[in-house]
Amino acid sequence: MLSNTKRTEIKKSQKKAVFETTKLYQIIDESLIAHIAINQDDQPFVIPMLVWRVDNNIYVHGAKNSRLMRALKQGQSCCLTFTLFDGWVLARSAFHHSAHYRSAMVFGQFETIESNAQKNQLLNHFIEQIAPGRSELVRQGDEKELTATELLTMPLTEASVKISNNGVGDEAKDKDIPVWAGVLPYRTIVGPLIDDVEHDRSIPQPDYSSVYGERWYIPK
């Protein structure tokens, strides 16, 4: 269960708060991109980054000389947000139009992964989450590449989750208005694969559908 701290307490629309750790994991794993907020020289920055999870830790990587990596490596406290948009809620009044979404907010400090061997292992884990079996086929990062890459980790010890999925919430006075009401779903579809222009046609396309479930593209 997620702990309720001063920073993670949900004050607006508390009924949308969710405390199951599994929901937090699902949002992180599906969204892939986090917006990371930092403060540098009294100037706020919000930077979108690829983020992946292994057990109860998240990981982010980038060039060592980047603004974000330098700030996070110094142990600066930061906030990350993950958001999945699931659809529009079309009500009978303009005021009650809203959205279905799943969101998570994570607080903490990142720590540096120093070992190149550990970097390689964790980066391969990320590849396997995207394309199972691929890390065994591609060239592994060499010492120069791994040394130039900053890899940081943060435990998921302070986080909140908010989910909106309750459909239309019209007032009684509006329910007789003769207009369609309901949900316009949004869904991210993964695939089909697009070959590189220099792809050797004798190499068959792989099947990565196992990690995407119902989001995998199925031709009609």
PLM features per residue range, with description:
Residues 38-41, 68, 91-95, 139-141:
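Catalytic micro-motifs at enzyme active sites that drive phosphoryl/nucleotidyl and oxygen chemistry
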Residues 1-7, 119-220:
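C-terminal edge-of-domain segments
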Residues 57, 77, 109, 150, ...:
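Structural motif
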